[in-house]
UniProtKB/Swiss-Prot annotation:
One of its GO terms (biological process) is purine nucleotide biosynthetic process. It comes from Deinococcus radiodurans (strain ATCC 13939 / DSM 20539 / JCM 16871 / CCUG 27074 / LMG 4051 / NBRC 15346 / NCIMB 9279 / VKM B-1422 / R1). The lineage of its organism: Bacteria, Thermotogati, Deinococcota, Deinococci, Deinococcales. This is Bifunctional protein FolD. InterPro entries: Aminoacid_DH-like_N_sf (IPR046346), NAD(P)-bd_dom_sf (IPR036291), THF_DH/CycHdrlase (IPR000672), THF_DH/CycHdrlase_cat_dom (IPR020630), THF_DH/CycHdrlase_NAD-bd_dom (IPR020631). Homodimer. Its EC number is 1.5.1.5, 3.5.4.9. Gene3D superfamilies: Leucine Dehydrogenase, chain A, domain 1 (3.40.50.10860), NAD(P)-binding Rossmann-like Domain (3.40.50.720). NADP(+) binds at G179, P180, G181, I245. The keyword Isomerase does not apply. It catalyses: (6R)-5,10-methylene-5,6,7,8-tetrahydrofolate + NADP(+) = (6R)-5,10-methenyltetrahydrofolate + NADPH; (6R)-5,10-methenyltetrahydrofolate + H2O = (6R)-10-formyltetrahydrofolate + H(+). Pathway: One-carbon metabolism; tetrahydrofolate interconversion.
Amino acid sequence: MQTSSEPAASETAALLGKPLADRVMRGVRADLKAWAQLDPPFEPQLVSVLASDDEASQVYVQSKAKRAKKLGVAFRVVDLGAAATQEALEQTLRELSADPAVHGIVLELPLAAGLDADAALLHIAARKDIEGLSPANLALIAAGREPEALLPPTPRSVRFLLRHALGDDLRGLRVAVIGPGRTVGRPLLFMLNNKGATVTLCNEHTRDLAAVLAAQDAVVVAVGKAGLLRPEQVQPEHVVIDAGINVQESGDMVGDALPELPVRAQTPVPGGVGPLTSALMYQNLVRGVKLQRGEPVDD
């Protein structure tokens, strides 16, 4: 079951992703070690597909490569460049999906201008879609059938952290999600609803945001706009989960919320959502591989 391995809840003012990621990775390493000891040894392969010059995507790819090397997962990048055509992108995804040597595929978003991500995601095999963004996986989530899906790692990371801060039972809690994007906001809306939370969906243009947020127990921000969430918009009892990533000219990475907001708890950027997201992606890889190999998979 996708949620059975989620860490137990505990209140904390410093919502760091690494301690939770370490718990997830212990299980991932155990499976990878067992495969490495087979005769012949089995090593899963993860492929990251780029079709843009987006700086944040480059950061994510570098992070994935480092983690894969440490784990013993084969990793390669297919960089089609910002000038890639829709046809070339879709053909690449079809070929990777059909390749038995490839076990996980990540399409790095956003794509270059003119490319259709929704159309491209249709060409990733559901069991290789370790980012959980294909229509097949998202439809299962929206239908409340999470155990059958590969859940998107970033929104799942957000939900982990909310449960860690507010308790395992999210029923009745009020959560504002700022940013209705494909990778975080949209799937998170359904994933929180599946756990009984009451979700208010906002965007960067929401009027009188402070008034909208006042009644919430938690605020999730995932727009991709540095400094979007400010002190005057939050309440002392809020838990703030910052899923934004913005690379400044200096090369520093910052979130969508200003740091050290006057709230009950907040995730830092970097160090909050990111480490846990990476761990959950590899957990999805392991689960997807088991489905592909016909091995038993926990519901």
